[in-house]
Amino acid sequence: MSITFLIITCTSCSFEGTSLVTAGRYLWNDNGRTFQFDRRLGLCLDCNKVVAIEDLPDAETMERARSIRQTYVGQPLFSFIEPDYAKYLASQDGFDVLEQVIELNRQPVCLQCGKSAVRPINRPEGLTGETPVSLNLGHPWCSGTLQMQTSGGLRIGVRPETHVYNIHGRLISTYDE
């Protein structure tokens, strides 16, 4: 499978990262139960690089998902088809694992080192492969600002991997799909 990607650079130094770090499947596992969770692009202040970080649902979404879960019958829904994120979450196998993670009341963690010193990176409007767009995010290791652009027509072949974590965000295993 080949995909386009985003490129993150700094205006003042040679720092570079890509959105390819978010490729693959990410699972929480607890006592044999699993839940496939969402991740997003972030900057880890401990790893000093662009990484995948957990994307935890907010309290309102979780409350709605719990309510929907009580009466939901049917197969798990696909996130790219179901517009209601709470309904999507409620339909998923292993929802109890998600609830355990939320009950820990912890911050999202870096999915490389497991620490919570992360800053989410939001995709700005108007991205192209021609001119980088500012992320309005200072680069912590120099005086520069981070910027983003698309890979344009460049596509990279990725080998899908599954990453399995415990409910505290610590990596247990990684395997090829």
Predicted features and spans:
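Short recognition patches in nucleic-acid-associated and regulatory proteins
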Residues: 6-97, 104-158
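Extended, charged low-complexity segments
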Residues: 142, 152-177
